[in-house]
A protein has these predicted regions:
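Basic, flexible linker segments flanking DNA-binding modules
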Residues: 8-104, 254-263
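Conserved, non-catalytic sequence blocks in retroelement Pol enzymes and Pol-derived host proteins
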Residues: 55-58, 100-102, 117, 175, ...
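Mobile-element integrase/transposase regions
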Residues: 59-126, 151-156, 160-161, 166-169, ...
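RNase H-like polynucleotidyl transferase catalytic core
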Residues: 76-81, 140, 171-175, 189-206, ...
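A short acidic/small-residue loop/turn micro-motif
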Residues: 129-130, 140-145
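Acidic/histidine-rich, metal-coordinating catalytic segments
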Residues: 164-179, 204, 251-255
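C-terminal domain-tail junction helix/linker
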Residues: 185, 189-193, 213-307
Length: 307
């Protein structure tokens, strides 16, 4: 009835809303690009940033217009995705304040970073379990839109925890536009997740550290010349990190071994990245240690006899 009174169609209203939603994503896309580039190049102008990053789907003039609209044309940076904006988008509260994380699937944290390949930038999204530091989901994309970044990463994470009741899980992020887009919020609502956002980057430190670990410890040391090679190397790097890399906060265990010992003892386990591992249970490890100790004592006695 209202549509007839206003002489507009329901389809036109939905199309207009889709345009607004896409613009909000693009605004946050531009804001993230400018913020990340200026972290390394504090005085770089928006035109130079555009030619450096060449964001897919956004031309130079629109990029500069968005920067002007966001107040990013000057060197002083302001991230519009950190606060309520004029379209009515409201940030979620930070649910991690004063929270003690004591088990897997209690809190997942996510962040998006970029990686340069032959002068072109691609985007990598990670989702980690805050307790075990396991990368439970990730994606590599050519664009920064929700359907290319956080949604495939979250779908991977949910698939990885298949059969586990995830209702009530806290999904924590930095408040970027992808994390409050309509599509993403519909997915988290369906999963009965609780959305959480931080105001400052250090309040999402675990997710941000994963960015540095994968990029600096792995990807920077690979010979990557294409998007396809980047995808392959991210797969490989995540497998190595999850299954083999010792973590000081996990008693020098890898995330997979840590989860195995404290959560899934007695069962096989496959971590994201495709590498299957079979770990000994506590009893077999004790028996193995006894054999090692016994052999060491025997060798020592033989050495003494030789002397």
């Amino acid at each position: 009835m209202l549509y007839k009174t206003l002489n507009i169609s329901k389809q036109a209203v939905h199309q207009h809303k889709s345009v607004i939603d896409r613009k909000m994503e693009e605004l946050c896309y531009v804001a993230m690009i400018v913020e990340q580039v200026r972290a390394d190049h504090p005085t770089m102008g928006v035109r130079d940033i555009y030619y450096m990053m060449r964001p897919e789907g956004i031309g130079r003039d629109r990029f500069e217009h968005y920067c002007q609209e966001l107040g990013l044309s000057s060197v002083r940076t302001v991230n519009p995705c950190r606060t309520t904006d004029s379209s009515g988008v409201i940030r979620f509260p930070n649910l991690l304040e004063d929270l003690s994380v004591t088990k897997v699937n209690q809190v997942w944290q996510s962040d998006i970073t970029y990686f340069e390949v032959n002068g072109k930038f691609y985007y990598i999204t990670f989702i980690i379990d805050a307790f075990s530091r396991m990368i439970v989901g990730y994606s590599v994309s050519k664009r920064l839109f929700t359907e290319d970044t956080v949604i495939p990463a979250l779908e991977m994470a949910v698939g990885f925890r298949k059969g586990v009741n995830l209702a009530g899980l806290i999904f924590h992020s930095d408040g970027g536009g992808q994390y409050y887009s309509k599509k993403f919020l519909e997915l988290t609502e369906t999963l009965h997740f609780r959305n959480s956002m931080c105001l400052y980057s250090w309040e999402n430190g675990k997710a941000e550290r994963i960015n540095g670990v994968i990029k600096n410890n792995y990807l920077e040391h690979r010979n990557i010349n294409s998007y396809e090679e980047l995808v392959m190397e991210v797969d490989h790097s995540v497998a190595l990190y999850n299954n083999e890399k010792p973590h000081i906060k996990l008693h020098r265990m890898s995330p997979a071994r840590f989860e195995k010992n404290f959560t899934f003892a007695e069962s096989d386990f496959t971590a994201p990245g495709g590498r299957e591992i079979r770990l000994c249970n506590q009893k077999s490890r004790i028996e193995m240690q006894k054999k090692i100790n016994k052999k060491a004592i025997t060798n020592k006695r033989q050495t003494v006899n030789l002397i």
